[in-house]
């Protein structure tokens, strides 16, 4: 009886541990840099369009370097009060991401794909606060 109880407890603990483990988000999914025509940055009601290849390259590189988190993106927009909207425009398509500050950390959220931790330098680049 003790042996069965020990196996039962071990099984419950293993299932609990497996269920509690958190998986990081899938890698951020961005269009190929060569296909990007422009990037629109919307802060509040103001939208700026960027088509400079060097700026686009820097922006895409920073987004690709963001670290995946275990946080899930389950909404069309982030569940925070203030965010910056990023529209990456290619011929015939648009990819939308959001950037926001939460508890002194900067995040990029790609709806239904994942939430990624970025740095203040990227945030300053897209807001124009260098």
Where are these regions (language model features)?
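Repetitive helical segments and hydrophobic/amphipathic motifs
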Residues: 11-12
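C-terminal motif of bacterial Sec signal peptides marking the signal peptidase cleavage site
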Residues: 15-19
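Function-determining sites in protein domains
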Residues: 4-7, 20-130
């Amino acid at each position: 009886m003790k042996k069965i109880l020990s196996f039962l407890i071990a099984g419950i603990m293993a299932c609990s541990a497996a269920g509690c483990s958190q998986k990081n988000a899938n890698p951020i999914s961005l269009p190929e840099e060569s296909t990007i025509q422009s990037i629109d940055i919307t802060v509040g009601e103001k939208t700026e369009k960027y088509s400079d290849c060097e700026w686009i390259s820097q922006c895409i590189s920073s987004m690709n370097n963001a670290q995946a988190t275990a946080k899930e993106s389950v909404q069309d927009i982030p569940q925070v009060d203030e965010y910056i909207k990023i529209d990456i425009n290619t011929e015939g398509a648009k990819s939308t991401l959001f950037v926001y500050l939460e508890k002194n950390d900067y995040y990029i959220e790609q709806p239904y794909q994942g939430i990624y931790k970025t740095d203040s330098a990227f945030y300053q680049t897209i807001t124009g606060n260098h």
